[in-house]
Amino acid sequence: MNMLDQLFTKARSIGAKIMFNPGNLELDHQRKLLGLLSDVNVLIVNKNEAKKIVQGTMLSEIVARIKNYVPAAIVTDGNQGAIASDGQETYRIGLYEDVIIKASTGAGDAFGSGFLAAYSDGRSFKESLIFASANSTSVVQKIGSKAGIINKNVKLHNMPIQEIR
């Protein structure tokens, strides 16, 4: 955790933005993790991981509580999609397309990496969520955690994203 703290401090000092997907080591030390979150711009976790950070049962409630620690949060919930907040708006996003799931290995990582790729490429938060969902949807149609990863230039269609009040 000390190494992460140093890394985050250095990143902030050079103006870098931080998207963080904590692992079990960080999640098992809630107090230290909460201290690190002040440096994080976007936190992405799955529902079970989020429950190790804050209390709550409903996904929208969990995201609302996480927003007390970070400017933007994304909490994924398997084939139920995700709830995400950019600090201004909160969105519920489902699966990009209704597909036959061959394997779910790598789906969460594909969502996170898809979001990061699109967001760091200058796309809006909402557009990045669509790219993330498309990437994850593509990955679950293949066997293996890397098969199906989409190219940043892939043509995407719109998908419904519900704004939550």
Residue ranges and their predicted role:
Residues A72-V75, N79, Y96-E163:
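Conserved post-catalytic alpha-helical subdomain immediately downstream of the catalytic base
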Residues M1-Y91, P160-R165:
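Ribokinase/PfkB-type carbohydrate-kinase core domain
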